UniProtKB/Swiss-Prot annotation:
Predominant cellular place of this UniProt entry's protein: cytoplasm
Cross-referenced InterPro entries: Cytidylate_kin, Cytidylate_kinase_dom, P-loop_NTPase, Pantoate_ligase, Pantoate_ligase/cytidylate_kin, Pantoate_ligase_C, Rossmann-like_a/b/a_fold
Organism, scientific name: Synechocystis sp. (strain ATCC 27184 / PCC 6803 / Kazusa)
EC number of this enzyme: 6.3.2.1, 2.7.4.25
Catalytic function, reaction form: (R)-pantoate + beta-alanine + ATP = (R)-pantothenate + AMP + diphosphate + H(+); CMP + ATP = CDP + ADP; dCMP + ATP = dCDP + ADP
Compartmental location: Cytoplasm
Record keywords: ATP-binding, Cytoplasm, Kinase, Ligase, Multifunctional enzyme, Nucleotide-binding, Pantothenate biosynthesis, Transferase
Record function comment: Catalyzes the condensation of pantoate with beta-alanine in an ATP-dependent reaction via a pantoyl-adenylate intermediate.
MF terms (GO), sorted A to Z: (d)CMP kinase activity; ATP binding; CMP kinase activity; dCMP kinase activity; pantoate-beta-alanine ligase activity
Pathway(s) per entry: Cofactor biosynthesis; (R)-pantothenate biosynthesis; (R)-pantothenate from (R)-pantoate and beta-alanine: step 1/1
Family, as annotated: In the N-terminal section; belongs to the pantothenate synthetase family. In the C-terminal section; belongs to the cytidylate kinase family. Type 1 subfamily.
Residues at the active site: H37 (proton donor)
Protein name per the record: Bifunctional pantoate ligase/cytidylate kinase
């Protein structure tokens, strides 16, 4: 049964008891839940041990004359739905509990004006300061490992990511794709204000964005042409009054003029009134190639499959294992005790790692601080140290940032245990490659026999693999999990070639879509 807390003291006491040793996810909402919120909650429940749903209609983000008083509220319905989805806790504080003064006399978080004074912020002064203030309070109160936000509120998402970066907050921000009705209308609590006729009229927003997306896919990079394509569709529905239509950099929200950049994702954002209801929508125009994320337990054949998929598609194999080996080598080279985590963090935080892709069957080359260590990272001493280093939070944070940097341009295939859930949660194609414990043990036994080692017991191998699975799936940092949107491939009765071909066909199917 879902627990409901109205006070900070009650929630924090519960989290200290029930959340000890568990991953905590936060889904901040203003209530009146719809399918878009449902997608956030489902993903959070799938990925986190304990999920907190906050319901708070934030007065700080409503301006004079906006719909604060009539904003839809349905706490009983929200509670029932949250419980059915497996949410552990609802935090529904009062204005007083969150320290909001009627006179506005409270500490306020002020994100960069360049991000808050464009798009919606240009028409809703103070809105994003109100959002940032309450979200920061929620992060401080709940201390979540991951917070989930919808991509529909793209400006809010970009500002919160910047807030987390600038304030050195430890929470990970995870975005989830916009959920739409069959008509294409983006899910919103305000959709219930619309009459049936207005709801039909509102579908023009997404159709207009799709028109620009089509031009973009055809190679048009001129801002004026893309805006014209959108406006032509909007003009066919004169009852919809556009407040703004703009192309901005997706991360910084800076307006773009002239020609779109090829490197960075671009946000096409729109706000319009349908009757008296204000709606927003957006699409990201991204020139990068897709990313394939392959996860799975040890012994499932991920490394071999991933490399062959990359070769077969002409993509880059992102050897994340080589990155961890590189840092393990650096720690050994500098004489740092592996168990001295502060010293490890100090050393590795400033390390420069560069991968040097090589054609199969050569292993990936690596430079550390400009030094080629491609052979040095393959020694037994480094191999023995890798798992110890990989379990440290500072090391994982360092390499997570580096891996995502490689992913900025796309066109990569990466494998691991948390690639689709942690490193590239928005990868276009996610694969969970697995096999039974018995099958993986048989494969391992064949490897040992091929090396001339005949004194290996199959039953012991099975026990070792099962134990490794348990450790990987229950570790505190980035546990092995199947992403909710991953395609599972069980390889017990498949050859490597068959698995590779299956993944390549899935990739081609995605590209056609």
């Amino acid at each position: 049964m879902v627990q409901v807390f109205r006070t900070i003291a009650g929630l924090q006491t519960y989290l200290r008891q029930a959340g000890r040793g568990k991953t905590v996810g936060l889904v901040p909402t203003m209530g009146s839940l719809h399918a878009g919120h449902g997608s956030l909650l489902k993903r959070a429940v799938a990925e986190m041990d304990l999920v907190v749903l906050s319901i708070f209609v934030n007065p700080l983000q409503f301006g004079p004359g906006e719909d604060l008083e009539k904003y839809p509220r349905d706490f009983d319905g929200d509670r029932q739905w949250a419980e059915s989805l497996g949410v552990a806790v609802i935090f529904a504080p009062t204005v007083t509990d969150l320290g909001i003064d009627a006179k506005g006399d409270q500490t306020t978080v002020l994100p960069p004006p360049a991000m808050t004074e464009v798009l919606c912020g240009a028409h809703r002064p103070g809105h994003f300061q109100g959002v940032a203030t309450i979200v920061t309070k929620l992060f401080t109160i709940v201390c979540p490992d991951v917070a989930y936000f919808g991509a529909k509120d793209a400006q809010q998402l970009a500002i919160i990511r910047r807030l987390v970066q600038d304030l050195n907050l430890t929470v990970t921000i995870r975005s989830c794709a916009t959920v739409r009705e069959e008509s294409g209308l983006a899910m919103s609590s305000r959709n219930q204000y619309l009459s049936p006729i207005e709801k039909e009229q509102a579908t023009v927003l997404y159709r207009s964005l799709q028109a620009a997306q089509q031009r973009y896919r055809q190679g048009d990079r001129q801002v004026s042409a893309l805006l014209t394509a959108t406006q032509d569709v909007l003009d066919a529905e004169p009852s919809v009054q556009v407040q703004y239509l703009q192309l901005v950099e997706a991360d910084t929200l800076q307006p773009i003029t002239g020609t779109l950049p090829d490197q960075n994702p671009v946000l096409m954002a729109i706000a319009a009134y349908v009757g008296s209801t204000r709606l927003i929508d957006n699409l990201v125009l991204n020139h990068r190639l897709p990313i394939i994320a392959i996860d799975g337990p040890a012994g499932a054949g991920k490394s071999t499959v991933t490399r062959q998929v990359a070769d077969g598609l002409g993509l880059t194999y992102l050897d994340t294992g080589a990155m961890y080996r590189a840092l393990a080598w650096l720690i050994l080279d500098q004489g740092i005790a592996p168990e001295d985590e502060p010293a490890v963090a100090e050393l590795t935080s400033g390390a420069e790692i560069e991968l040097m892709p090589r054609p199969a069957p050569q292993l990936t080359g690596v430079k550390v601080n400009g030094q080629d260590v491609s052979d040095a990272i393959r020694t037994p001493a480094v191999t023995q140290l890798v798992s110890t280093i990989a379990a440290q939070g500072a090391v994982r944070a360092k390499l997570l940032k580096l891996q995502r940097k490689y992913g900025d341009q796309g066109g990569i295939v990466a494998e691991g245990r948390d690639i689709g859930t942690q490193v590239f949660p928005n990868a276009e194609l996610k694969i969970f490659l697995t096999a039974s414990v018995q099958e993986r043990a048989r494969r391992r036994l064949k490897d040992f026999e091929a090396q001339g080692n005949q004194a290996v017991d199959l039953a012991q191998l099975e026990a070792d693999i099962a134990h490794r699975d348990h450790l990987d799936s229950t570790r505190a940092i980035a546990p092995l999990q199947k992403a909710v949107d991953a395609v599972e491939i069980i390889t017990d009765n498949l050859t490597i070639a068959e698995v590779v071909e299956t993944i390549i066909e899935l990739y081609k199917k995605y590209n056609k879509g």
